Structure formats: structure tokens, C-alpha cells
């Protein structure tokens, strides 16, 4: 979570909404607190407003009956029936995979098989080799609906034509509810940091770590850039696991995570973060969450697979100041995310191309910004790599593409005793609630291992603070987007 400054105030340039709220209710409860005493959450009645060239538009709310009526008006009664079938399947997937995947410290194949056997309605989405886009083409006739629901693959950094059909469950995860955070998503990070300090955690923000010290076959300390050494019995690394494999925190850590846990890489992004006056016919209808679809998905994801910038990408626009409902007066804060290939170096023509392919298209669709953002408002894949060395600019960690991708993602325990993983690059994956769950899994692993070694008797049922515990990381003003 991060912000960048603007004349209208700090712009959230990372995640834009909160989903799976129960994860955070549970997290605050673990510390004996209530989330609502620390943050004001703004429920979004419309999950997203979807736009296509030619003027067609579809709002989705998460209410199956209401959404089916909207789909009927948008694409006809047959597609409304198809939507109901898809929604039922996605609901079944979400319920079946929650306990054996999301809530488990690692995906358990036996438990997954058992859960799936009891839900034959979800079997069509589990066929090996069937992509999410392929599955949706069997569900819907209207290509716009295929395009809309296939896009959920990008929420975890995958291409719809290569990501597995099981990712249809992301629709139901979002449909369970979307909240904006008053003041911006970074307020969640601030609230958690404040709570951690109250519990005795020593936060050292913007403190670079030079290496994780390995001695006698286990982690013994973390060495900071200024030479300070922090002895530890356990170290939780919340960066991209690819940094370990690249040796950025010490040669002795290269084999802590298998190569299959960090490659292939997920998508990156070009991200605009700025303040401006929105004008044009579409301006009154912009909401917090907006998606402007490309005319041809193949023209978007084909170039991405080749490491190129699409000529007509889909554009995600977060109008941050519209989360509470009324249209603000004066400049507003906006974040626009354009999918990008990982590992792409900055090229001289990239700014002009990305600017034209973003703002010329929006002008054609009836939306303009005054002033239009300059180069300093754009975060590129190469910038993300510099911010997160070893990541190749991927903002979702390992790619979710492939039938068994979820089993390849690294879990909390690494091959090096004393070293643990948390964050979007670890199980269960990318996204704010998933990263939070990864922290829960890492904490449980640390406590279990320390207890087994006779170093602690701490229980996970009540808040505890470990003397000398240290968290290092970046300030929230860094530039690193994630949806």
C-alpha cells in the first residue's frame, strides 16, 4: 500500500478496494480490537461499472437477482440465465476452495478433491488445461460477458487465455462485498502499524536490509544497510521470494525457495496516479470502480505475452474521491492501471505511447482530464523492478497460469530453518486479503517452530508480542501499484 502526492492530497497508488472483509475483522479481533474503531469502511453498492466502445455499460452489484436483471437488459434473457449458472458455479468454487486452499497453510490436494467431489456443479471449471476464457466461452454467447468475467484472471496477474478456469471463484470473492477505506487504502496500513506499535512491535520503516545472515544451516540475524545486525530466531521475509532466489539478501539464500515457486512471472503494470478535473459526457457517471474494456481481448493479451505494450488495452480507473457517493467539486484523485508484461525495460517511446493509448482512448469514449498527467505520474514495470529487486516488475509474484500453479506458489516455511515467507508472492497469493492470510500462516509457522524448539509457549489465540521483534519495509510513499 502506498501513496503519491498530488495537489488534491495523497493518491492511493496501490490497492484500491478492500474485499473479504472478514479476514481483517479477524485480524483486529486477534489483537482484542474492532476494525471499525480504527477505520471507516465505505461499502460500495456497485462493485464496478463496466464500459465498452459504442456506449454499452453494465453495473454489477453482487446481488444475484439484481445482476441477472442487469445482464438481461444488457445482453438478453438467455445470457441472464447463463449468468445465473455461472454465478452458482463460482459460488461453489469459492466455498469449496476456501478451507483447503485459502485458509490452509498450503493447498491440500486431498482436501481439495474431497471438496470438489461433493460439488459436481463445479467440475466443468476444473478440467485440466481449460483456461478461464475457454470455460467462459462455454458459459456465455455474448463476447462482452466473456471478456468481463475473464478479466478476473488479471486480478492475480494472469492472462485469461492461460489462467485456469478455477479462477472464476474470484467473481464470488468480490461479489461478497467491496469496501473503500475513508482516507484511502493506505489508512489500513497506518492503522495496523499503530496497533502493532501499541502491542510492542518495533517498526523500522524505510530501513534497507543488506542481507539475511545464515549460520550453521539456519537464519541467525538480519543485517541492515548501515551495518547494524539484528539477531533473531526467526525472520519473516515479506518481499517477493524471487529476491531470495536472485541472491539479493545473500548468496546462502538462493536455494531457500525453489525456482518453480518464483517463475514464470505474473503481469506487471503501467500505473497513472494523479489529480485532475474530469470532464466530458461520462464524467457524471464515473464511480469509484470503473473498467473501460478494449474492443478485442486478443489485441490486448497477445502483445502482453510477447513482452509488448498493447495498442488498445483495457483501462481500470479508480476515482478515489467518489467512494462516498457524491461527485466532488474541483480536482479529483485518480489511479489508472494498464496491464503490462513483466521484465520490460523502460524504452524512450513508452511514455508517449502509454499516454496516447490511455488518454486518447478515454477522450474517444467521452472522458477527459485537465490537466493530463505528465511523466512523473507514471509508474512503469522497470520502476517496479527497481523498487522491488528481483521481481521483474511483477506485482503479483509467481504467475497463476497453468492448472497446478497454486501448488507451485511458495508456502510460509522455506528450505532454510528460521526463514519464513509472507506477502503476495507467498501462498495463498496476491491481493490484500490473501497477503494478510499469508501473514497469518507465517505467524502460525513461526510460533509452532519456536514452541517445538522450546523457545516460546505463545498461543495464537491471544495477542502476543515477541521481545526484539522488528519489521523493516518501505514508506507508504513508495511507487508500487497493486490492485
Please report, for each region that a protein language model flagged, where it lies by residue.
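N-terminal glycine-rich phosphate/pyrophosphate-binding loop and immediately adjacent elements
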Residues: 1-96, 398
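A conserved FAD-binding loop/helix module that cradles the flavin
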Residues: 15, 424-447
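General small-molecule cofactor/ligand-binding pocket signal
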Residues: 40-42, 202-206, 374
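Rossmann-like flavin
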Residues: 53-162
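A glycine-rich dinucleotide-binding beta-alpha-beta segment and adjacent secondary-structure elements
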Residues: 142-156, 312-316, 368-428
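Helical element adjacent to the flavin cofactor pocket in flavoenzyme catalytic cores
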Residues: 168-223
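Mid-domain catalytic core of redox enzymes
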Residues: 210-328, 462-463, 467, 478, ...
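FAD-dependent oxidoreductase catalytic-site/capping-region signature
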Residues: 314-399
